[in-house]
Amino acid sequence: MTQGQGFGFGLGKMKELAAAIQKAQQVQEGAKKLQEDLEKMEIEGVAAGGLVKVIMSGNQEPRRVEISPDLMSEGAEVVADLVTAAMKDAYLKSTTTMRERMEELTGGLSLPGM
């Protein structure tokens, strides 16, 4: 190694590394809070104009299903189809919410797959 070359890890690089570590810690703390927030959220999926509702958490955990008594005369197959449609609606809303919140959390970072 020639005089003055070192390892190429000077003071500027150390500051960059320290900033990157700090940002990673902030993201980790934010991710923990986000997970807690998602668990507390209630996201509603609907079908048949609200006659069927599926409520799930922000991380896609099913909470409850609400079916209007007016639908019970329609038969099991119709009710099952509407519950499925409401589940899909809730899932889509939940994953969209999760993705948006993750983008907010990781904003400004160059992370693969985000």
From Swiss-Prot:
GO terms for molecular function: DNA binding. It is found in: Cytoplasm, Nucleoid. Its main location: cytoplasm. It comes from the Bacteria. Coiled coil: none annotated. GO terms for cellular component: bacterial nucleoid; cytosol. InterPro entries: YbaB-like_sf, YbaB/EbfC. Keywords: Cytoplasm, DNA-binding. It holds the Pfam family YbaB_DNA_bd. Gene3D superfamilies: Nucleoid-associated protein YbaB-like domain. Homodimer. Belongs to the YbaB/EbfC family. Binds to DNA and alters its conformation. May be involved in regulation of gene expression, nucleoid organization and DNA protection. HAMAP family: DNA_YbaB_EbfC. This is Nucleoid-associated protein Cyan7425_0899. It comes from Cyanothece sp. (strain PCC 7425 / ATCC 29141). The lineage of its organism: Bacteria, Bacillati, Cyanobacteriota, Cyanophyceae, Gomontiellales.
